[in-house]
């Protein structure tokens, strides 16, 4: 099975506690997911799985992937949060690729930031 990245979008790089300090992580995630869908031309119904990487967990959303997924994607789309410090988004993309390669999904939204 071949896989391809069809679009990219991420939250901005900022110093912790700076410009977006008052913006909840879930809100940033929703913006990133909506924009990734828009750039790719895909609809939420085309996504079989959401794999969301995060550097620091938000205590208000311990599984931010599910919170963001419920807000943006169909409720049937499973979502998992990957936490691996600075390489979280890369690990999420790797995990998403694996889901496609083993036949568990055809469309995966993976990465974030």
Please place each PLM-identified region on the residue numbering.
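Short amphipathic alpha-helical segments enriched in leucine
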Residues: 10, 33-38, 69
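Conserved catalytic cysteine-centered active-site region
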Residues: 23, 54-106
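Short beta-strand segments at enzyme active-site cores
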Residues: 46, 51, 109-110
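Residue-level "edge-of-site" marker
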Residues: 50, 81-82, 113
């Amino acid at each position: 099975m071949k896989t391809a990245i069809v679009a990219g979008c991420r939250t901005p790089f900022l110093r912790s506690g700076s410009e977006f300090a008052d913006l909840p992580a879930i809100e940033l995630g929703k913006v990133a997911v909506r924009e990734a869908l828009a750039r790719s031309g895909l609809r939420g119904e085309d996504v079989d799985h959401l794999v969301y990487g995060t550097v620091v967990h938000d205590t208000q959303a311990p599984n931010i992937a599910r919170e963001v997924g419920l807000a943006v994607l169909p409720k049937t789309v499973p979502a998992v949060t990957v936490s691996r410090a600075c390489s979280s988004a890369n690990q999420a993309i790797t995990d998403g690729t694996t889901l496609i390669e083993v036949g568990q999904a055809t469309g995966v939204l993976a990465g974030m930031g």
